[in-house]
Amino acid sequence: MVSAPPHGMNRYRASVSYDGGSFHGFAENPDVETVAGKLRESLEKIIGHEIHLTCAGRTDAGVHAEGQVISFDAETFDIEKIERSLNKLCAPFITVRDLQKTNDLFNARFSATCRTYRYRILNDDYPDPFSHRFAWYIQTQLDIDSMQRAAQAVVGEHDFSSFCRKATILVDGKEEEASLIREVISITVKDEGPFVEIWVTATSFCHQMVRSIVGTLVAIGKGRLNKSDVSSIISKKDRNSAGPVAPPQGLTLMEVGY
């Protein structure tokens, strides 16, 4: 449930880009440096009071973002000044844009209607030292047409147990398995030679869902699975039936819809 800011506070939102290879994921972890930890510490240093951050999607270690969205409550401040100061403290691996006051019931996570991720593969004869942090290098020539055809089987509402890590939630104080039913709005496999880009938009994602779908599509692109196999993989609801999880560096959270 989304609540309004405490008395004397305003709600703010911002877009955030980051190089995920420099952090151990987005979510705070006291033992390692994370995106949320760096942002919160920087905001608290500038603003002078405790901050609680909410994000649209908690990316894993090594996963990047161009269009992550955060929200938080704070006392009134000079937006332009705070944004400049924040970018100085967070550079060079995090950039904050479009910091603005928003409505009291906005929540970066729960107000979102969809998220779009891009997965980038370098499909070339030679690796590229300038893209290795942001793409999965695969030398074997991929059958992009078969990958695109196969990908359409994931569109719609499905139980994505075959493509996600199991998770639990607390219900009345007891742990229960979380639902892995999700709705994929669109998926496209693009030839952007020498890169192959896989764009996926869904209302929400479960853990490792995009990377598992990509790993399966790559197996199809290499001829190790048939393009007709995706539907049966979904219906099995068995993680072992899908392809391997693609490495994190090729994945970027591109946009969040509201």
Language model feature labels by segment:
Residues 2-258:
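Structured-RNA-binding interfaces characteristic of tRNA pseudouridine synthases
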